[in-house]
């Protein structure tokens, strides 16, 4: 799956 980590300028997959 794709887990969205909002720990950057944009969502990282």
Curated annotation (Swiss-Prot):
Write the Enzyme Commission number(s) for this entry: 3.5.1.28
Q: What class of enzyme is it?
A: hydrolase
Signal sequence segment: none
Regulation of activity: Inhibited by phenylmethanesulfonyl fluoride (PMSF) and EDTA.
Q: Which UniProt keywords apply?
A: Antibiotic, Antimicrobial, Hydrolase, Secreted
Q: Which GO terms describe its cellular component?
A: extracellular region
Look up keyword Secreted and say if it applies: yes
Q: What is this protein called?
A: N-acetylmuramoyl-L-alanine amidase L2
